[in-house]
Amino acid sequence: MNRKKISRPLYYQLSLVLVFCVASIAAISQVKISGKVTGADGKGVPLISVVVSNTSFGGVTDGEGNYSFNADLKPGPYTLEFTGVGFKSQTQSLTVGSESAYTANVSIVEDALNLDEVIITGTNVRTTKKQLGNSISTINSKQLENTGASNLTAILNGRVMGAQVTQNSGDPAGGISIKLRGVGSVFGSSEPLYIIDGVIVDNSSANVINLNADAQGARIQTGANRLVDINPNDIDRIEVINGAAAAAIYGSRASNGVVQIFTKRGRVGKAKVSLFTSLNFNSLRNRLEMNTVPFRFGIPGDARLTTTGDRLTTIANLTGTAGTGPAALGGRLIEAKYPVTRYDYQDDIFDNSKGTDNHLSVSGGTDKGTYYVSASYLKNDGIIRNTNFQRYGLNVRGDINVTKWAKVTAGALYTNSTSKDLPNGNNFFSPISTMTIIDNVWNINERDANGNLLAVEQVRMNPLSVIETYDLRTETNRSVADLKLNLTPIRGLNIDLTNGFDTYSQTGNTYQARIPYPAVSAAFFPDGYVSYARYNYFQWTFDGVASYKFNLLKDLQSTSSAGYSAQYIKTTYAAQEGRDLIPIVRTIGAAQNLFTLPVDNRTQQSIFGYFFQQTFGYKNKLFLTAAGRFDGSSAFGEDAQNIFYPKASLSYNLSDEDFWSSSNFSSWFNTLKLRASYGKAGNLTGVGPYDRFISYLPITYTGGGFGPRNSIGNEDIRPEIKTEFEAGADMQFFKGRLGLQFSLYNQEITDLILPFNIAASNGATSLVDNIGEMTNKGFELMITGTPVKNNDFRWDASLLYNKNDNEVTRLYKNAGFIGLDATGTQGVLEGYPVGVYYINYYARNADGSLLLRDVNGFKLPQVERGDAATNIPARDANGQPSGTPLRQVFGDPNPDYTATFVNEFSYKNLSLRIQLDRVAGFEVYNWDWITRNNVGNGKLAERELNGEVPRGWVAAIGGFIGPRIQEEHVQDGTFTKLREVALTYTLNKLKFAESMKVSLIGRNLISWDNYVGFDPEINASGQSVIRGNDFGAFPIPRVFQISLTTNF
Amino acid sequence: MKKILNIFLSSVLLIGVGCKKEYRNPNAPTQEDVFSSTDGMTRVIVGIKNRFAVNTLGAASIYQAISASGLSTKELVVQNAGNADLAQLENGGNNLAPNNGVIGSLWSTTNIVNSEAQKLINGSANVGDVNLKNAIRIYGHLYKAMALGTMAAFWEKVPLNNGENAEYSTRIEALTLAVQLLDQASTLLGTTTIPASFTSQVGAEIDLKNTLLALSARYNMMLLNNDAAIAKASAVDLTKKSTFFYNNVNPNPVFRSGVTTANVYGIRTDFGLSGALLPDANDKRRTFHLVKNTANGSGFFQNDATAIPIYQPGEMLLIQAEANARKSQLATAKTFLDQVLQKTAAQDAFGVGAELPPYSGPLTQADLLQEIYKNRCVELYLSGMKLEDSRRFNRPAPGAAGAERTRNFYPYPQQERDGNTNTPADPAI
């Protein structure tokens, strides 16, 4: 038999690995069970799994809907379970007697809501959506296909209720952040917990490059989020639970929700080989409009405009003045203009680029065990020249049925990811920022006789210096492995033991060449800069869950679970920076000036918890679950460990009641499930392992010292507690053609942790402490429908809508505004969402028009002033603003709602999928806009040159004639994006292959927005809590991809 | 079957590993670690010195004192109008907002120095060895006095001791306490043999004996205690140097974060002086302070490694000149002034020498004081003392004709006011 030929060597290998667990198998009579599964149309349904209940025997239907497997069963009554994605599960009883072969044919019906979909997330006991009192989103492998996204995180976009997925950067190695139901923490991460095959995996973004880049104190986390190491082609399904309900099972680490990822595994049957290959083409989607007026204010100093007087002519008159400071600015701005050539630097910075993604997998198995192996290679070049991302991956998984009651599954995933980067935003030596901070009047392509680039504006850098001579690299080696033992020693008892680890080593090297031209600010490292950094991460997960399911009464089923989980996390981080480089060498050895101390930082942390959960199910329609959990983390003091977190949930499948089926509406209103849940969770990773201590920094000064820090800890700090209530319903109409799911939720976060500014007379300036309360209230809705469906043509549509209101409801200790970034532009203010822009604004007349003031004969805008204590504006005798500049809230970076509208059309073997995303009601702080106009390359500067606004208008807004009017810099980011269009054609039963699929996919094709920048979605702070920060971030490219999937 | 059981059991045993509930931080000591041993406290002395002198853990006291005083008294000029905080100081008056970053960090770092120095004083009580006990206490006194003296140069009221809702005292009380602390330390030093190993650990580049005297002279002068100022200043051995030292890792903050960037601030021509105060064209101190190297460095800010003096010999001479002049001992005052004017670079411990003829102006108190002030402006250029000097010598105040400074005193930082109900009212100017 073919099957044995293929399975033997693998079985042999797995046996070697797991030799210790091979046990003798009691010989019981072997029977063959086979049959056919058909749909409502009478056609066979493929990929339906058939399992003998409470045993490990089973199989999967083939392309015609037929299945067949052998099982070692004692004579007696059994139940066969038929389950499959998109279908209602079905059971059929089977009595094993003396015969050796049995046939069971069933017909199954479609289920748009997948209420009978088997869910693993939430309990290790397999359960169905039907039983859950909380909302859960699932993404199956079919939905994972036909997407041009190479980062797993991007795939969740538009497929998960309550999720806001943001691509923070268009860098091929850039990151993506996800928030489930809004911001859950400010000091800690707001990202959900990621679990791959039962093992918790890290998704952080360590900075191993860009060590010198955060000029703004914006807590940048700009690299890739580490889920980029996981190849989406290896994913079988994803389950997402949004709220604190997840935490009752996964522990408090899941207080921001949990994303559980299951990788592909082999299926019983002959070996299947699948090959995926694709090519993608990237280009800049949106070009900035730059100043095109061929004049400039001022008097040219020299032909190359390199004198002091040629700086910043939009905002300052620097000609013939000794200093260049505000004293000079106080003078009249030059109104004279001189002719210049204006350039569009975008031509020099951006380039079209290509990429490729390849994946090969082999899988198969027998009733004794299955296997899945895959290898992959991805390379993608960025649209900013000299950037790329590359990933090699290897994935192995085996499932073995050791005995009738014991299963072992083991898997390992290895990835090598490398990237070539350039400095991200938040400084003036990134590719975008170097272009933003100079007027577009210099020919940046000019070179001297030696081929060296020439200087541009004094102090600044030529953008091409960054692109051509910088060399930034990262390399990550990662492996995630798991070993899971599943025991079903007696009927109804299920024990799962999972051991696994996630470990990676991430190295970053930065080389910024010496700048060959003079007068570049020392802050931009004109003498060259080099750094290396290494981050090692190790996380070990243990989970043990036992559950027992039995019928308490005839109609009352009881499931009891108890479990223990523990994680141990160890990190090491080492880094060194240097400047003043000798030539040729590009590593740290080139540095003649090691201006920072070598960094060697190690942490260890343990997180532990145990839980008990009890579910009662009444007639398979009413389910009540209650659970309790104790959790602790070594990051907190002894008194704050072992906190009790309760949970309760209720699910009522009203449509299973007799009155429903006998009613006349049941013909079109088929399913109604009501659900409600309540849960509490503490954020165990809300503070770093040692943040609670007052610690001194070891310094190299004199004979070595302990430096007192500005920030101190509180040893009695407690975990942030999130209490969440959610209620919702799942409905199905017209025989599954229309589905409607919604949830309402209310999260209350108490003891919110923040670094709180204290009076320096305390002896420190900030204290990390429990400082406030925050809520997230929201509404999630998903409508799925199939408006048209006939033999050849099918139209599926879905609408996802998530609304979330975040508010910091209380700050303890009378805390006022707490700035999150160093500039204090955005932060936390009682009564407002996290990250509000609390800023200076225009002084206005009573009728709302701008209150202008006379500056050298020009009427210019100015900031509102008044009494800072009361925030009430004041006017002097002349009716002009007086007092200190006042601040007000102007927007925040959290969207009011996000929505995704997907339409999928299929005609025979051709299908078309169109995804539209809308993110509405959020604001971006447009630093680049300020800079572009201040230096003269922006469109407002152009208007001033054209005389459409008075001379000095830009300077007045930009903060050079009076304080900066920040209100003008906050811009609406609302956008609707044509996120993805995928056209797919499938060919079946070819001579050389079982099937072949060709896809043409476009991503990020069009954005409808009013934002004056590359893209309102990007965030220069990356995955940081600082959002809406547009300071030189890489724009997201438009991508066209052609892919070919062949199944052999 | 047995083997499966073994897996199960070993898994359960592994749980034990994850159960450790407390991990010590291998990267940094806690406050308890630090103040429970002599060695820990010795290293905090270095840490405090670092906070006062180096920008590693936040803007250093000396950096922001030089920056703020320099910008408020026209010693420095802002290089990029985009540096709003610096521009506020340069423009002064109502432009200086309480949330100004420069005065904010000057305030916070100096308060931290005060707080940590007090912890040293308190912690020294638990040290057994009397020499070490005294040594730690002396350094505690020194840095607390420096913190109080620095704050008193910029604010009208100062918290003498740190804590929640700290109470404020007048700057006179702060300076008085600073003088007491320094004089007590001097007395204590007389009866203490500081172990050589201790000195080398905390830094021999600070000559303790003379620094205590020099600072006492400085703060007595600020208090206009003329006799005490003369007594202390005259006791200082002018051949000895006391400095904050720098290197690549601990760079000279005024050089690295200030002048070399060409984008923060720079020195002014003629020390920012004009009119009657315009220094003589032949004044050799012009060369010392005003000639910039290719990295924009000059004076005590030539490069990353240039040491900044804690006091200069010239200051001690000028204190004696000033105190005598204030006492109307004009002839004596002139002798000290002439010592400064005639001093050659070679004669000065730091190479600061005017090499000018002796004072030949009218021998009146007012004229002498003006010449002394002018020489302080030149000799002690960018030492962070000019705002205090400008006030003490009654130079034209902000708003007055020919104003030479843009503020008299600074407003209290916003963060201080938000967190301390005892924060006094801001000065009008």
Regions found by a protein language model. Name each.
Chain B
Residues 1-28:
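Bacterial Sec-dependent N-terminal signal peptides
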Residues 150-159, 193, 222-225, 328:
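Short coil/turn linking the two alpha-helices of tandem helical-hairpin repeats
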Residues 81-90, 224-317, 344-359, 365, ...:
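Hydrophobic-face positions in mid-chain alpha helices that act as interaction patches
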